[in-house]
Amino acid sequence: MTNKLIIQGGKKLAGTLQVDGAKNSAVALIPAAILAESEVVLEGLPDISDVYTLYDILEELGGSVRYDNKTAVIDPADMISMPLPTGNVKKLRASYYLMGAMLGRFKKAVIGLPGGCYLGPRPIDQHIKGFEALGAKVTNEQGAIYLRADELKGARIYLDVVSVGATINIMLAAVRAKGKTIIENAAKEPEIIDVATLLSNMGAIIKGAGTDTIRITGVEHLHGCHHTIIPDRIEAGTFMVLAAASGKGVRIENVIPTHLEGIIAKMTEMGIPMDIEEDAIFVGEVEKIKKVDIKTYAYPGFPTDLQQPLTALLTRAEGSSVVTDTIYPSRFKHIAEIERMGGKFKLEGRSAVVSGPVKLQGSKVTATDLRAGAALVIAGLLAEGTTEIHGVEHIERGYSKIIEKLSAIGADITRSTAAETKL
């Protein structure tokens, strides 16, 4: 890609940042609309490439999608179970939600194995285990997953690994199955509650979303509805870290503070002043940051998606901080890039030791995945001089209007249009 972000670092940021709808909800809510038989209206969707890719896929299936600003009106009435072995499905990891939704509605689907961020092995074996338990035959042929069922019947499904994707996918497939489904060792993320709320508004019978046991009683038909997406807790957390790194008073609006308890606790431990309101968080200016140890866990633990952005902030902390990722042990690709800027790190197994404080210097760096990109933006804002970040497409997959938002609070950040490439 010839696209790059250019950041002139060292500026103090002040003002208000608005958080958009949750990316990890949006990519499941849009496929979930396939299960309805009339119009579904989704409000508050983020303006990111994954969302537009999903609109294109729904239109390929024969659905109609009208969208304006952050609202989409999806009419799934004329959809057919068209095979999707290649094409748009390969562009995003979350295209696997089409498996559960199409299986639930049509009893069959062909979905090319998805792309998105590369974070080491991310098998979908738990998804497949769930589909098979519901009565589907699943085969992998030439890089595409083929699913077919004469009928779907409720089942008791125990997830061997707590997986957000598998929990949601099994919910999508089970809401129109015959009888009762119980998902045990289910993931508890807020995005799962969001998807369950949409499905319930469509007429599904779901109990226990947000706990480790979800009970679903299948229904024959689901109807359209109105649904407003929850705010993106990872975008909110990223903005909190960014405000602590380079801010002199930044207010972050459209947040649900209970979704952010992990990052709030750690930033408090680091000595960062915060004012927590009902739907906003104010992050004050901080001179000295205390070192802190972090371990990522499934929700409600500290989120793996905020591990990388926080690593950039820890270059400012006094002493050695240890960051351990128990979810994705190989999620440290950003470290080599921040080292180019003068960061001091030591990798030990699934942990990174961050030594500080160091003054980062602008450099040419590359984002290898979405949250690594966020970490490099924070590092670039902290650094003296000019930072060029390549791999912009990764950042734009998950952060909508990032340049406009950061420019509005005083960041000097531009997108190079060297050879404009359509993303």
Swiss-Prot record:
Binding-site residues for phosphoenolpyruvate, renumbered to this chain: 23-24
Post-translational modification 2-(S-cysteinyl)pyruvic acid O-phosphothioketal, affected residues: 117
The keyword Cell division belongs to this UniProt entry's keyword annotation: yes
Main location: cytoplasm
Annotated compartments: Cytoplasm
InterPro entries: Enolpyruvate_Tfrase_dom (IPR001986), Enolpyruvate_Tfrase_sf (IPR036968), MurA_subfamily (IPR050068), RNA3'P_cycl/enolpyr_Trfase_a/b (IPR013792), UDP_GlcNAc_COvinyl_MurA (IPR005750)
Catalytic activity: phosphoenolpyruvate + UDP-N-acetyl-alpha-D-glucosamine = UDP-N-acetyl-3-O-(1-carboxyvinyl)-alpha-D-glucosamine + phosphate
CDD domains linked: UdpNAET (cd01555)
Pathway in which the depicted protein is active: Cell wall biogenesis; peptidoglycan biosynthesis
Superkingdom of origin organism: Bacteria
EC numbers, comma separated: 2.5.1.7
Binding site for UDP-N-acetyl-alpha-D-glucosamine: 93, 122-126, 305, 327
Pfam families, alphabetized: EPSP_synthase (PF00275)
Any Gene Ontology CC annotation: cytoplasm
Record NCBIfam families: murA (TIGR01072), PRK09369.1 (NF006873), PRK12830.1 (NF009470)
Protein name: UDP-N-acetylglucosamine 1-carboxyvinyltransferase 2
Species assigned in the record: Listeria innocua serovar 6a (strain ATCC BAA-680 / CLIP 11262)
